[in-house]
Structures are given as C-alpha cells and as structure tokens.
C-alpha cells in the first residue's frame, strides 16, 4: 500500500475536455474567484454565486436574481452546479437517514444523524478504502478511487437540500460534519481539504471549525501536512492499546506505529484552535480482542501524554466479519478503568444499525480496483458484504 499526498491547487479549474462544463461545486472560494476573474468578472461575483449555491442550495443560475442576465447566460455556457444524486434512501427508527449517492457508476453512503441539540452528517471521501481494517465493512469492499471535491461537498449540499425541504417537526438542519464515512480522508487531501474549506467558508456552509471533524487511521505524512493546510477537529481511529493488536486490526500501523502516529497527532493539536488542546480517540470494542481491563490500563498508560477524550464504540457487525461485539458489562468495566485514570470517556450510542448505517457498516457499491474480494476468495475466506 502506498499513499500519494497532493495539496490543493488550481487543478479543479481544469475540465476533462474542451466541451465539458466546469462544475462549480469543485471550486473553493479562492478558485471560484479565479474562475470569475478569467471570465472578466469582479471577484465579488464569486461570493454572490457561492451564497446562492450553499446558503440556498440553488443549482439553477436563472434563480440567482441579483446576478445580471448577461452573466447568467455566460455561466450557463461554461459552468454547472451538479451535485451527486441520491439513488436510495433508508430511514431508521431512531431518525437516522442513510443515503446511497451515485458517483459515476458506483455508490457511496452518507448518513444524517439527528440528536436533541444537533444534526451530524457523516460524509465519505473515497469509493471504498485501501486500508483494510479488519473490523470495517467498507474495507472489505476494496478501493476504487478518490472522490472529487464536488462529490464530497455535494454530499453535504444534497443532504442540506433534502433536510431543508422537509417541514416535519424535529428535522434539524445540519450543524456538524464528520469525515468518517467511506474511505481514509488523508489519502485524498487534494479534494478533502478544499471541500472542508467550503464547509467552513462564510459563503459556503459557514460551519465552525469545531463542528467539522476529520477522522484518520494514521497516514502520518499527510497528518503532518494537514496542520499547515486547515484547522478542523481531529479524531483518530486508534482501536488498540499496543502495536501487536493494532498491527492485526489496523494494518497501516505496520507502516506508522502508534508512537509515530501519536507524535504526529500531538503536533497537529498543538497548533490547532479547533481542537482546544485535545484530540478525540476512537476505540471500537471487539469482544476479547481489545476490550479487557488489562487493555484499558494499557490504553491509559499509552495516552497519558496525549490530551484527549475517548469514545468507546460498540462494534457493529456485518456478514462474514471475524469478530463479536463486546458485551455491555465488558464495555462498562473498560470505561470505568479509563475514568479512574481521569479520562473523559464516552460510550457512543449506536445509531442507524437497523439500516446498516452505524459506524463501520457503510459499504456502498464499489468496483474494486484493488481486487481485494478476488484475493479473499482465492485465499478461501468468505466475503459477504451487503451493498445498498
């Protein structure tokens, strides 16, 4: 496995062929202003169009009534606002909504999670995932490609448009975005960072940097670069108290071990305002794998120099997985040990598991360029992952 780190530039201003239109959802504000400058227009026109796009979820230039007709006609000739379409929707009894979203000839999944005081959108960054974490349904699908900026921010745009159109009492607007869907965000920096910039931009979705969270399994070179690119909340998929266990369940650990990963994490939060001096640790609870009290003591020792809060995540099963969910009693004992050490510890409430929308269950529909499924079959290992 190798990773390519690409920083945002003006590549989004290019189109596949001379007849194609530029999708304005691919452009952050800096790129949008450059686009309008190249059209001979003033930069403020970019701000006007972005406001229509993101504040009102408008994808029709003719509806942008504070823009003159001549410019609207020019825009229709060279540009478009095209978000990926929802092809299937599932609603959980707890209010969670999972959308299967078409990206080309494949699907990714986006999840809307309403709570009493907020509504969180879980967004995908890749079609599939190359990291092969053993407990994650997405990883069993293999990897196909990175999502474009328009396909990432388009998930937020599409969800905001749907939620905004629902007048039912209790449907909350999106207040938080977590990059915790399909894929490893740090292996797609050149698209993830501009998409998050749009989430934060006042002319975009205008979210607070503390309400946009990037979750990573530990692509250290990219994490080292991230702090110079954008400031958002950070969550790390740790899931183990030592390298022996993590090597097995999170294979990227063999390349960047826990010590290297945590050093990079501390470097990021030291210069981040969004994290307020601490990081969120994600720890999936696997029955008799990483959930013993001895593991809790080991985790506490490991994290003693890393300011953090710890989210314990009851594992969500999927067909063919080799693990079991930790019992409530084992999770409770684990949590109590951590709290005795003074760690803020939260047991995450499982949401959307009746529609396979819970953490680790997102599968989508992936044409596997890594041939992972074929390799597994040749090795005699059963694969039975549900696609939406």
Curated annotation (Swiss-Prot):
Chief site of localization: cytoplasm
Any GO BP: tRNA methylation
CC cofactor note: Binds 1 [4Fe-4S] cluster. The cluster is coordinated with 3 cysteines and an exchangeable S-adenosyl-L-methionine.
Record's Pfam families?
A: Radical_SAM (PF04055), RlmN_N (PF21016)
Quote the record's binding site residues for [4Fe-4S] cluster: 129, 133, 136
Enzyme Commission number, as recorded: 2.1.1.192
Q: Which PANTHER family match?
A: 23S RRNA METHYLTRANSFERASE (PTHR30544), RADICAL SAM CORE DOMAIN-CONTAINING PROTEIN (PTHR30544:SF5)
The name this protein carries in UniProt is Dual-specificity RNA methyltransferase RlmN
Q: Which gene encodes it?
A: rlmN
């Amino acid at each position: 496995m190798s990773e390519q780190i690409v920083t945002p530039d003006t590549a989004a201003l290019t189109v596949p062929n001379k007849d194609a239109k530029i999708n304005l959802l691919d452009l952050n504000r800096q790129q949008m202003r450059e686009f309008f400058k190249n059209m001979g227009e003033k930069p403020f026109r970019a701000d006007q169009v972005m406001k229509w796009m993101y504040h009102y979820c408008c994808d029709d230039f003719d509806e942008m009534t504070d823009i003159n007709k001549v410019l609207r006609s020019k825009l229709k000739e060279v540009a478009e606002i095209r978000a990926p379409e929802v092809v299937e929707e599932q609603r959980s009894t707890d209010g969670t909504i999972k959308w299967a979203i078409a990206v080309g000839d494949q699907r990714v999944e986006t999840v809307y999670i309403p709570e009493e005081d907020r509504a969180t959108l879980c967004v995908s960054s890749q079609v599939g995932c190359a990291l092969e974490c053993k407990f994650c349904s997405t990883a069993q699908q293999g990897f196909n490609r990175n999502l474009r900026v328009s396909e990432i921010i388009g998930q937020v745009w599409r969800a905001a448009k749907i939620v905004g159109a629902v007048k039912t009492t209790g449907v909350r607007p999106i207040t938080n975005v977590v990059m915790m869907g399909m894929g490893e965000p740090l292996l797609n920096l050149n698209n993830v960072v501009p998409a998050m910039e749009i989430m934060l931009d006042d002319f975009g979705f205008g979210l607070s940097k503390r309400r946009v969270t990037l979750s990573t399994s530990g692509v250290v070179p990219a994490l080292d670069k991230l702090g110079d690119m954008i400031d958002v909340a950070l969550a790390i998929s740790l899931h183990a108290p030592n390298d022996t266990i993590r090597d097995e369940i999170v294979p990227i650990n063999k390349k960047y071990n826990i010590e290297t990963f945590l050093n990079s994490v501390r470097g990021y939060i030291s210069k981040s305002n969004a994290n307020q001096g601490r990081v969120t640790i994600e720890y999936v609870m696997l029955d008799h794998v990483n959930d013993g009290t001895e593991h809790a003591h080991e985790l506490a020792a490991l994290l003693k120099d890393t300011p953090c809060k710890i989210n314990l995540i009851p594992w969500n099963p999927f067909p063919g997985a080799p693990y079991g969910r930790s019992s409530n009693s084992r999770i409770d004992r684990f949590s109590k040990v951590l709290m005795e050490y003074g760690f803020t510890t939260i047991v995450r409430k499982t949401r959307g598991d009746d529609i396979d929308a819970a953490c680790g269950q997102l599968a989508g529909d992936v044409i596997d360029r890594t041939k992972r499924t074929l390799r597994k079959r040749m090795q005699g290992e059963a694969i039975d992952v549900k696609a939406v």
